[in-house]
C-alpha cells in the first residue's frame, strides 16, 4: 500500500546539516585516512586532482584558512538531530515501513554540460540537484538503498527506499 507522507521542515533542516557536516567530515576523515593508509598522497594533492567542475569549485576552499570552524560543525550536528526527529515523526505518524522516491530527479548529463542543470525550469548546481533526494536520509543516518528501475531516454534510473532509524 502506498501512502503519501509529508516531511515538513525537511529541506530546511537538511540544508542546515548537509554541507557543513559532509564537508567538515570529509576534510577531517580523508586527511586521517590518507595518513593511516600511507599512500604517499596528501589531502591537498588529492583535492588538486579533483576534475569534476562542480566539486573542484567547492573543495579547495575547505583547506587552510578556509577550513570550517568546529562551532559551525557543532551547529550542523544540532540541525541533524532536528532532521532525525522529522523522519522519526513521519514514520511514527504514517506507519509506513519505508519511504519510496526516485533516487535522482534527473538522468545523467553529458560531461562538459554538467556544471549546472535545469530542474523544473530552474537552473542550479549539478551536485546539489543530484543529491537532493538522497541527501536528507543520508544526513539523518537512516538506512537506505537504491535499486535499478530501468531506463529513461536510454539512461539508468533508480528507486530509493529509506527506512526508520535502526531498522536496518
Question: At which residue positions do the language-model features occur?
Answer:
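Glycine-rich, small-residue loops and helix-cap segments
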Residues: 67-168
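Acidic/polar loop patches that form or flank catalytic/metal-binding clefts of enzymes
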Residues: 2-6, 40-44, 98, 145
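Short helix-loop capping/hinge segments that flank enzyme active sites or metal/cofactor-binding pockets
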Residues: 24-85, 106, 148-156
Amino acid at each position: 500500500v502506498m501512502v503519501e507522507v509529508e516531511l515538513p521542515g525537511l529541506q530546511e533542516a537538511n540544508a542546515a546539516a548537509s554541507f557543513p557536516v559532509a564537508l567538515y567530515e570529509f576534510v577531517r576523515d580523508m586527511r586521517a585516512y590518507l595518513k593511516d593508509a600511507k599512500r604517499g598522497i596528501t589531502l591537498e594533492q588529492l583535492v588538486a586532482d579533483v576534475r569534476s567542475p562542480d566539486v573542484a569549485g567547492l573543495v579547495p576552499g575547505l583547506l587552510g584558512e578556509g577550513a570550517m570552524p568546529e562551532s559551525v560543525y557543532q551547529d550542523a550536528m544540532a540541525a541533524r538531530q532536528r532532521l532525525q526527529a522529522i523522519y522519526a515523526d513521519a514514520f511514527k505518524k504514517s506507519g509506513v515501513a519505508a519511504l519510496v522516491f526516485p533516487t535522482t530527479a534527473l538522468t545523467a548529463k553529458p560531461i562538459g554540460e554538467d556544471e549546472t542543470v535545469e530542474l523544473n525550469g530552474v537552473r542550479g548546481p549539478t551536485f546539489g540537484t543530484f543529491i537532493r533526494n538522497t541527501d536528507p536520509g543520508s544526513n539523518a543516518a537512516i538506512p537506505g538503498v537504491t535499486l535499478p528501475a530501468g531506463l529513461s531516454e536510454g539512461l539508468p534510473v533508480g528507486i530509493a527506499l529509506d527506512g526508520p532509524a535502526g531498522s536496518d
